[in-house]
Amino acid sequence: TINQTPSAPTAGASPNPICSGNALTLTASGQSGATFTWTSTVTSGLITGSTAVGAGNINDVLTNSGTTTGTVTYSITAAGGTLGCPGPTVNYIFTVDPIPNVSNATLTQTICTGNNASFIPTSNVLNTTFTWTATGSSANVTGYTAAGAGTIGDVLTNSGTAVETVTYVITPTGPAPNNCVGTPVNFVVTVNPAPTVNAVASQTLCNGSATAAINFVSATAGANFSWTNDTPSIGLGASGADSVPSFTAINNTNAPITATITISPTANACAGP
């Protein structure tokens, strides 16, 4: 009796290519009574999770820890009948795409109100694309785009007195045809307000009179103040910081002198009006 050689096996499988971390299911079939054995070999890339030797169906979870596409070759051999005559071996090559990431080292930015929030996302996987959504910490921060793709470039305004933030949630997606989706990351922009200074009343004095000291107040926490005096001959220096001290007003002319003191508030490296 000469047993026949089984026909070449065929296999129905899950989608190919697959994304890293996904399950691969391969079901071999052939003529009635045939059994199947197989081996697997990583033929390119940094692929783990493939079972080296097995029989019957293939159920592996394949992981690509690299940044480029990898492949695993499954070699399936059929044996037929009670005597198990070996048949031909058929190779099935599975492609495993890596999961892209957002590889930027810095995911925060601090700006002053009215300035540009700028971020160019990069990835470990070539030809990755990026989509994002944005939310503000309160209604006082405006100017951000609610959803977009690619580079972020919004001019952000903080109309309040407290520090506000805008959080961009960026999602990387690998190239077609598999379009593997990576883990979203947050890019957080801190938007400092422009500090203000309280209104200061003008003073009218006689020559030789003492002025009232001027103390500045801002609604923005941590504000500092500098000032300049355009007429130092009145007895006050040309510039100073924080408050304006009391001084003796001087006018050695025959006409009134008007001096203008200009106050410049700053907070968190942002200048106010």
Give the residues covered by each predicted segment.
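Extracellular low-complexity Ser/Thr/Asn/Gly-rich intrinsically disordered segments
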Residues: 1-273
